[in-house]
Amino acid sequence: MSETTPHWLTKRADLSPDKKAIEFEDGSSITYLELFHRSQSYARKLGKLGFRQGDHIAILSTNCAEMIQIIYACSYLGAVAVLLNTKLTINELNQQLLDSDAKVIITSESFKASEFVLQRMDYNELESVTEDTSIITLKSEIYFDDIFTMMYTSGTTGFPKAVQQTFGNHWWSATSSALNLGLHDNDKWLIPLPLFHVSGLSTMLKSVIYGMPIYVLEKFEVEKVHNAIMDRKVTIVSVVTVMVQRLIKRLGNHHYPNDFRCMLLGGGPAPKSLLEQAKLKNIPVFQSYGMTETSSQIVTLTPEDALKKIGSAGKPLFPAQLKIAHNENNPNQIGEILVKGPMVTKGYYKRAETNKEVFENNWLHTGDMGYLDEQGYLYVVDRRNDLIISGGENIYPSEIENVLVQIEGIEEAGVKGSPNEEWGMVPIAFIVCSRPISENEIAAHLEKYLAKYKRPKEIHVVNELPRNAANKLVRHNLGK
């Protein structure tokens, strides 16, 4: 029988009715009681329109109060919230709407109804629906085995797959994070990442489970994030590597307030040089490792280890397990990362064959490559699918990228494999520069730090690198 708890938002509204739940950049805020009432109101409106338990309701929106309320409305209805990426083309969105079996798509006003393959409602249209309390009974309890949300993987390999996330997955993710980072009375978590991304969504849910206010930005902007940390009493922020780079540059010779205690870094390995810069400026960067399939981070450094184990993602969170395929007793040997725990997805929606391939005795094959050191700390090397095999040698793009960004004036770097008749594949690089840099300068630096077979055979200067909505580098789009 599935484990149950009182509905999280109902419970939080009872425990902390007048406490701020969400703050926005325009200065407005919502209490937990207000969030409870508004979410239940949307649930009754959806019920009036005929949506019921088990229905899939797609949401396409930038970060805003309505999006948060409708996600919680789905939980009161017993519906599954399908969270879609606003950067996708209409064709990609329609593919996911059909694949997810969504009954409706709810959007902000900027998306036109005529473009979608199914019924579309914007926030104003849903708001205008009258409530009817007699039609449905809203959920008072949460069943951990029930699917709460679905979000699509970024699709770096083939057609994106919908990851099913249960209430239990989200609960264990939130409580495990609290056991690692701790909870402080003054905590306020900044969300500059999209709520349709697992990092943004998981922090939104932590707010209700912890009773901790969140500060929500519509999108990442350096100045707004900087000001929030400096002036809005933010103590924790979730970031990816490119955000850290830009925030360090914006900070200059200043320092963050003493209450700012954690910059939680996800989205892939970060250059060691960047982490050293952060350490010099006393910026508390905690590397982590996680994915949509693990409902946010599953491996994180502790506050005690953040400055001692630079470059490591840490150890598995309390209820989680991790191993390296075929290398369980061999430290420092690179292999595929496997994870297991109550925050790991049940599987991909309508992908029975894929689920058989990626799950082995409840261990999830992540497709990421890494190794454990002698103390059991994880070091993530790269995506297995980004691996470049050149003349039989394994080349990891992130290693080359890390060396390139050590050159003063190279702000960002991306590396991918390119077909080559002699070697099969060779690395080529794309860089974003803040000053003119000669080929000789780059070549001299690479020669010092990389074996010859790892050095890029081509280097292209570009204005920007392709990134997804979470600002993660999309290597297969380099050069397109």
Curated annotation (Swiss-Prot):
Keyword Ligase attributed: yes
Record-linked SUPFAM superfamilies: Acetyl-CoA synthetase-like
EC number assigned by the record: 6.2.1.26
Record's keyword terms, sorted: ATP-binding, Ligase, Menaquinone biosynthesis, Nucleotide-binding
Function per UniProt: Converts 2-succinylbenzoate (OSB) to 2-succinylbenzoyl-CoA (OSB-CoA).
Pathway assignment: Quinol/quinone metabolism; 1,4-dihydroxy-2-naphthoate biosynthesis; 1,4-dihydroxy-2-naphthoate from chorismate: step 5/7; Quinol/quinone metabolism; menaquinone biosynthesis
InterPro entries: AMP-bd_C, AMP-bd_C_sf, AMP-binding_CS, AMP-dep_synth/lig_dom, ANL_N_sf, MenE
HAMAP family on file: MenE (MF_00731)
Protein name: 2-succinylbenzoate--CoA ligase
PROSITE patterns attached to this UniProt entry: AMP_BINDING
PANTHER family noted in UniProt: AMP-BINDING DOMAIN-CONTAINING PROTEIN-RELATED, LONG-CHAIN-FATTY-ACID--COA LIGASE
